[in-house]
């Protein structure tokens, strides 16, 4: 195994100091962790600085920490914030590296086989390698991840044991090093020097680790001994400085040595023979032929190259696992005594539970029809109970914890006071009779004060009818539905903030992650229709959208008071009472949050003038112009990723895909 560097403590850097009930929350969470408490809930209202509290806890308990978010966008936001709080420590980002992913599948009804098709984001692949190598080299590591962290990744022991350790003065020949690099999936490329490659010039070997993007390493030999090792700029070759120890981890997470490879191939062949016998006994000759052809090709590739497309489907044999045994995941790269934080746990834990079943249903079809061996079923995400077995200590973070989290612990730490002094909004319940006229009057009041309005409906038809009605009444309104692409959704939110329009109508899009301080009114139609979007948790999340403005107000239109409505209203009133008392005791005057409005992405046309998406008519562009636009966008996407603005990079990626579909 790799010797980890000396323990380096987490060092939190921030211009803020804990305020409101943050100090109490931080102290309670830390005391409970140090006291051995396994699970806790941080029940933090919208806008109370939960990420800052999480950072304070990490810095005080000083444990490697995994933070899991329920989508890439939120993970990117958290990564950026933790990176600012811990500039001297290893803050890593681990999400799915696919820009586009079509999983392998088979549809028996139409006899359609869909081959796996994917586009890997090179920047995210680099960050994934950076995360795993950091975890094996040091302890001061925070990894912000999506639920990708519960998917199979390859054995951390094989990954660490395959690493090549180099020091000046070490006796090793140049050719031996080259062979070792090839064994761990590095490619020789003397022309195009990029991640996962090495090049050779006489007695000098330059290696570009998979976890880097700008800096590579130069290993200089004197005979069969390493003379010196330098860190260099990959583009210019300029020396940055000498290093006294270099560890090169494999260029892929699925790696095995020659001895294990032969053992793995023998197991694959044995399973193939068994499955072929089964198919032939059932008269499934087509399936048998299909399976033999595909598996024998993969075996040949593994034998000759040490790798094959879809190698992860053989991971059970490569890792030496028993049938049904869970795969290795990112969680296995952490030491035993690590901390897990689940952001927006009411959403994330549901995702963790659901991943396994969907994956198994698709793969079972591939196995039944001879596209994969049964062992492919063991290349899968963890079941929830398997995830739980990795948990040493965990903090669930949410404004509305789910039933699962509440069943795991009775330790709930509340964080209700906002540093800005903002209160939870007041709530009115009004009858649905005459709601259109009443709502129109409320909207006009907000327009007069240059404030914005969210309206949430239960059905697409209701949203469309309401949009048409408000437009007829002269209101500047937009309807945001599920068909709208990520980039366009961001533009709609930006236009709402700028006042291009005043009212935004949606169904399930106005909950977590939509942060518009200009919104002072949230109207909930059909609030008394019990269900997923009108349960207590959904209502509290929707109410939270009005908690960023000092004049925040919520109107529920309903003909009866449901239990969910009453609980949401009571909880909001309880929080509001605590907030008012705190403000009064400390002389705090609530202020609306001030938040910059980020500019739209602009791209270069043939004239090289920066023109936003709104101003560009892609439909009328020639194919050549669209190609130039795509090239410019790809460059800007790379720049955004390098600046760690993954939300922006994801938006650019979505626009690139839209443009490519036009050709």
UniProtKB/Swiss-Prot annotation:
PROSITE patterns cross-referenced by the UniProt entry: HELICASE_ATP_BIND_1, HELICASE_CTER, UVR
Keywords: ATP-binding, Cytoplasm, DNA damage, DNA excision, DNA repair, Excision nuclease, Nucleotide-binding, SOS response
Protein's cellular compartments: Cytoplasm
CDD domains: DEXHc_UvrB, SF2_C_UvrB
Free-text comment on this protein's domains from its UniProt entry: The beta-hairpin motif is involved in DNA binding.
UniProt record similarity statement: Belongs to the UvrB family.
Job of this protein: The UvrABC repair system catalyzes the recognition and processing of DNA lesions. A damage recognition complex composed of 2 UvrA and 2 UvrB subunits scans DNA for abnormalities. Upon binding of the UvrA(2)B(2) complex to a putative damaged site, the DNA wraps around one UvrB monomer. DNA wrap is dependent on ATP binding by UvrB and probably causes local melting of the DNA helix, facilitating insertion of UvrB beta-hairpin between the DNA strands. Then UvrB probes one DNA strand for the presence of a lesion.
Protein name: UvrABC system protein B
Phylogenetic lineage: Bacteria, Bacillati, Bacillota, Bacilli, Lactobacillales
Gene name of the record: uvrB
């Amino acid at each position: 195994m790799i010797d980890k560097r000396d323990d380096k403590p987490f060092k939190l850097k921030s211009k803020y100091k804990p305020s409101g009930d943050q100090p109490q929350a931080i102290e309670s969470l830390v005391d409970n962790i140090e006291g051995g408490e396994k699970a806790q809930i941080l029940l933090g209202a919208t806008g109370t600085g939960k990420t800052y509290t999480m950072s304070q806890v990490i810095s005080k308990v000083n444990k490697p920490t995994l933070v899991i978010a329920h989508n890439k966008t939120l993970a990117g936001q958290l990564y950026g914030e933790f990176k600012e709080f811990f500039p001297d420590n290893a803050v890593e980002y681990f999400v799915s590296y696919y820009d586009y992913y079509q999983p392998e599948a088979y549809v028996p009804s139409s006899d359609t086989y869909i081959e796996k098709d994917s586009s890997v984001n090179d920047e995210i692949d680099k960050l994934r390698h950076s995360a795993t190598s950091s975890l094996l080299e040091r302890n001061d590591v925070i990894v912000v991840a999506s639920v990708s962290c519960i998917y199979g990744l390859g054995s951390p022991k094989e990954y660490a044991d395959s690493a090549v350790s180099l020091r000046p003065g070490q006796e090793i020949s140049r050719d031996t090093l080259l062979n070792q690099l090839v064994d761990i999936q590095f490619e020789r490329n003397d022309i195009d020097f990029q991640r996962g490659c090495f090049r050779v010039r006489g007695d000098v070997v330059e290696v570009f680790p998979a976890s880097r993007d700008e800096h590579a390493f130069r290993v200089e030999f004197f005979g069969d001994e390493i003379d010196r090792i330098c860190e260099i700029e990959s583009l210019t070759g300029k020396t940055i400085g000498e290093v006294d120890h270099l560890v090169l981890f494999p260029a892929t997470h699925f790696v095995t040595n020659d001895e294990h490879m032969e053992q793995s191939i023998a197991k694959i062949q044995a399973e193939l023979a068994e499955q072929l016998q089964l198919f032939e006994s059932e008269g499934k000759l087509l399936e048998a032929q299909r399976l033999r052809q595909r598996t024998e090709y993969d075996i040949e590739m593994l034998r000759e190259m040490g790798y094959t497309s879809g190698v992860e489907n053989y991971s059970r044999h490569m890792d030496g696992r028993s049938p049904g045994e869970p795969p290795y995941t990112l969680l296995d790269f952490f030491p035993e005594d690590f901390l897990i934080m689940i952001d927006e746990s009411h959403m994330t834990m549901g995702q963790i539970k659901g991943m396994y079943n969907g994956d198994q249903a698709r793969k079972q079809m591939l196995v039944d029809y001879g596209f994969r061996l049964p062992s492919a079923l063991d290349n899968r995400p963890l079941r929830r109970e398997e995830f739980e077995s990795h948990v040493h200590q965990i903090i669930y973070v949410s404004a509305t914890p789910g039933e699962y989290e509440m069943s795991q612990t009775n330790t709930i730490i509340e964080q209700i006071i906002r540093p800005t002094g903002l209160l939870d909004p007041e709530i009115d319940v009004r009858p649905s009779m005459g709601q259109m006229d009443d709502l129109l009057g409320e909207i006009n009041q907000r327009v007069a004060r240059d404030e914005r309005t969210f309206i949430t409906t239960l059905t697409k038809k209701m949203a469309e009818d309401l949009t048409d009605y408000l437009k007829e009444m002269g209101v500047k309104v937009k309807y945001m539905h599920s068909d709208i692409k990520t980039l366009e959704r961001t533009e709609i939110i930006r236009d709402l903030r700028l006042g291009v329009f005043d009212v935004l109508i949606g169904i399930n899009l106005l909950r977590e992650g939509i942060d518009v301080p200009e919104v002072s009114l949230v109207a909930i139609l059909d609030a008394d229709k019990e269900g997923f979007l009108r349960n207590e948790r959904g209502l509290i999340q929707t109410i939270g959208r009005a908690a960023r403005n000092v004049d925040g107000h919520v109107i529920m239109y309903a003909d009866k008071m449901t239990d969910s409505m009453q609980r949401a209203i009571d909880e909001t009133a309880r929080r509001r009472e605590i907030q008012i008392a705190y403000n009064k005791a400390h002389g705090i005057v609530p202020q609306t949050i001030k938040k910059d409005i980020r500019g739209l992405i602009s791209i270069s046309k043939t004239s090289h003038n920066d023109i936003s998406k709104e101003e560009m008519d892609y439909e009328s562009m020639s194919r050549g112009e669209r190609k130039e636009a795509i090239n410019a966008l790809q460059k800007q996407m790379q720049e955004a990723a390098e600046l760690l603005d993954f939300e922006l990079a994801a938006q650019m990626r979505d626009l690139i895909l839209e443009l490519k579909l036009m050709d």
